[in-house]
Swiss-Prot record:
Residues 72-337 form the Reverse transcriptase domain. Belongs to the bacterial reverse transcriptase family. Pfam families: RVT_1. PANTHER family: NUCLEAR INTRON MATURASE 1, MITOCHONDRIAL-RELATED, PROTEIN YKFC. Encoded by the CP4-6 prophage. A short reverse transcriptase-like protein missing about 140 C-terminal residues compared to orthologs. This is Protein YkfC. Keywords: Magnesium, Metal-binding. Mg(2+) binds at residues 166, 284-285. The keyword Magnesium applies. The keyword NADP does not apply. GO terms for molecular function: metal ion binding. It comes from Escherichia coli (strain K12). InterPro entries: DNA/RNA_pol_sf, GrpII_Intron_Splice-Mob/Def, RT_dom.
Length: 381
């Protein structure tokens, strides 16, 4: 079996029929060639030397890889496979806080990679074009470029506000049953769905204590980024239908044009101008760019909170979900974007790295150079 051809078939089937539900996925991911490729990718990653709770690292697994893959295959097909809890570690963030990571056992990472290889082609056609996080051939730079393009058509006199979306502890608050419901829209294989349920319910070990997973997907899991995108795709599609689709834009143009021309219905019913909205998301970070009044922007922020908290059971941090004007600048994905007047008198959008982030980078670079000076070699990892 040629894996890339099978992935292309999955992508084609999904793109051709948006309502298609794929069957027999478990049989696919347990093919020896499929598991072998998943193992190759897993063991070639930088994190392969880091063991999970079972203490098995890359060297130990490679010594008996063929046997271990056969055991995995038998367990998956028989339904006896049970993932181990992830090993919880904490890494420092730039603001001084700690970010929790869950490190699965290597054998579980292989299974998650096999699942990802099958699921990713199916969902790529479903995901919104303005979603950039954890997707093939997309990056932070693509997202920043998109936002800059969305801002370049604005003149100095046009209102342009930005909603800086901030989800509270997103990866830790994903609702399991809502996630499974979203996955079932594309997968009808009951055995595969059982495997996915076991994976998100595996829990983690923190300071020697087991903690069950009632909600959330672990940061550090191979399949977690895809699952997070599947969940937030519901939000993307809501915004698309409400503000971003061709129909929504056409309706807005007709509405505003009626007001401008003073048509009787618009005058009689005292219609208000509808705001224009642009959108970009990278994982759990998103921005909405609104051409309208401050009151309209605040109403849209409240609408977003209603969708996220009501339909998806996620929490929008209202204290951090700010509404700055583009002339005052805003932060997105570690970049500060601001609209300025150039020396030629034109308004343009400039992106810079905030001073605090630049200082942190300079400090880490200085520490790295000091290590080189002391040891004579760059210490990786």
């Amino acid at each position: 079996m040629i894996i890339s051809e099978m992935q292309r078939k999955l992508a084609t089937w999904a793109a051709t029929d948006p309502s298609l539900r794929i069957q027999r996925l478990l049989r696919l991911i347990t093919q020896p060639e499929w598991l072998a490729e998943a193992a190759r990718i897993t063991l070639s990653s930088k994190g392969a030397h880091t063991p999970g709770v079972d203490g098995v690292n890359k060297t130990m697994l490679q010594a008996r890889l063929a046997v271990e893959l056969q055991i995995l295959r038998d367990e998956l097909l028989s339904g006896h496979y049970q993932p181990l809890p992830a090993r919880r570690v904490y890494i420092p963030k730039s603001n001084g806080k700690l970010r929790p990571l869950g490190i699965p056992a290597l054998r579980d990472r292989i299974v998650q990679r096999a699942m990802l290889m099958a699921m990713e082609p199916i969902w790529e056609s479903d995901f919104h074009t303005l979603s950039y996080g954890f997707r093939p051939e997309r990056s932070v730079h693509h997202a920043i470029r998109t936002v800059k393009l969305q801002l370049t058509d604005c003149g100095e006199t046009r209102g342009r506000w930005v909603i800086e979306g901030d989800l509270s502890s997103y990866f830790d608050t994903v609702h399991h049953r809502l996630l499974m419901k979203a996955v079932r829209r594309r997968i009808s294989d009951a055995r595969f769905m059982t495997l996915l349920w076991k994976t998100i319910k595996a829990g983690h070990i923190d300071v020697g204590l087991f903690r069950a997973a009632s909600e959330g997907v672990p940061q550090g899991g191979v399949i977690s980024p895809l699952l997070s995108n599947i969940m937030l795709n519901e939000f993307d599609q809501y915004l698309h239908e409400r503000y971003l689709s061709g129909k929504a834009r056409k309706d807005r143009w007709y509405w505003n044009n009626s007001i401008q021309r003073g048509r009787s219905t618009a005058v009689r019913e005292n219609w208000q101008w509808k705001p224009a909205v642009a959108y970009c998301r990278y994982a759990d970070d998103f921005v909405l760019i609104v051409k309208g009044t401050k009151a309209q922007v605040e109403a849209i922020r409240e609408e977003c909170r209603g969708v996220l908290e009501g339909s998806l059971k996620l929490r929008l941090n209202m204290d951090k979900t700010k509404i700055p004007h583009v002339n005052d600048g805003f932060i997105f994905l570690g970049h500060r974007l601001i609209r300025k007047r150039s020396r030629y008198g034109e308004m343009r959008v400039v992106s810079t790295i905030p001073q605090e982030k630049a200082r942190n980078f300079a400090a880490s670079l200085t520490a790295l150079l000091w290590k080189v000076r002391i040891s004579g070699e760059i210490l990786l990892g």
